[in-house]
Amino acid sequence: MANKVTGSTDTSGALTTAPSIMKSILVVGTKKENSTTEIKENTIFGITGTADAKAAFGDNAVVEKIVKVFIQNGADYINGMILGSSETAMADALEASMADKSIKVIIPEGNDTKTIAALKDHLALCEKNDMFRYGVIAPTEEASATQTTLIAYGKTVDSDRIFIPSTLPTLNGAVVDPQVAAAGLGALIMTETDDPALPMNGVSMAGYSGLSRTMLETEMKILANNGITPLYLEGTAPTVYRLVTSCVTDESDHKVWQEGTTRFIADYVLETNENMLRANYKRTKNVVRILNAIKGDIKINMEKFEAAEIIENWDEATLTVTKDPQDMYGALVDYEFDVVTPLYTITITQHMKL
């Protein structure tokens, strides 16, 4: 029998991971009395704790509580922005926020119709500029009182990038401000979507001690089918039943973008591929060799996504990289993949131009 045996282990193929994307959460609010720091309006600044929020926003209890909920739910990269006083203050602030591409989630201090309209327009503008962001708007106590009022409220928001929690949480027996409620769901979107395909079902929020009302499962299903993210209690913690976008009025869009995971997956795949191409092809010739290299890099990324179970049914045959007939310096990239939801298998087609 041999008395010496040697060997080695090769782990080069043992791990499959998709690239992570830097992300931060932004709170936008008004400056109150007793602010102790001089920060200009519409300027992004970092927040590391509630003391920073109080110093910047002054006696703005809502913003301070929003930041506290962020921290309690693990959101550790927090930005703030102070609103101006003009009629277009929210729109102006959100436009200025585009200077920081790391911002993924926006929580405004208010939930009025003007704020919602500005947020919807901003999120749509960001998407057109390859910045993929989300917002959370919570209903007033009156709007969240019944299923009927909640569904009606959801129709006034109606966005595949805005989420609406169904019920206002309580803290020590008192119902919290709507946007303090929104902060919990916003923080979960920040911290629980590193794997964009992992459902949010059953994830609890910290920073609260109950819900203002509870619902039957059938009631929660109805809300989820109407653009409202239902919450239930797990012990004393508000917990996500099913994360859905508020996109409801367009039936075809509603079916595609109903599930939050579908929105997250589509954004994640497109953004990761775009970032990779920007990094690898800053200055190249538009020749067949480069087009083939681009195709190979996209193929590797898509295989990683499928191995990580982020996408399904990826078929290399759907991937094309061609010269842009309208632009001698441009290239066109197209591909398809599937996202499987509890109700549908959705085929996503993505297009890029270099």
Predicted features and spans:
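Surface-exposed assembly/interface segments
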Residues: M1-L354
